Swiss-Prot record:
Organism in which the protein naturally occurs: Kluyveromyces lactis (strain ATCC 8585 / CBS 2359 / DSM 70799 / NBRC 1267 / NRRL Y-1140 / WM37)
Disulfide bonds: C35-C59, C39-C55
Main subcellular location of this protein, as a coarse class: mitochondrion
Name of the molecule in the record: Mitochondrial import inner membrane translocase subunit TIM9
Keywords linked to the UniProt accession: Chaperone, Disulfide bond, Membrane, Metal-binding, Mitochondrion, Mitochondrion inner membrane, Protein transport, Translocation, Transport, Zinc
Amino acid sequence: MDQLNGKEQQEFQKIVEQKQMKDFMRLYSNLVERCFSDCVNDFTSAKLTSKEQNCIMRCSEKFLKHSERVGQRFQEQNAAMNQTMGR
């Protein structure tokens, strides 16, 4: 990144931010689709039942914890690869 001039760094940063937003939106969309499909079964009311609300809360927490764990493992593997390449 040090090889880039100011304008190139700004453009690079913009690309990174766009990718992060796209990744976040994909994560959010997957979360909504998964938890809605698994938890919402009663379409006779516009409101969620308490059972559906609890299911969605558990599903969301589990999904986010899993995503966080996968991200941590990816970072660990990436760091290990960088160490191996640096030798």
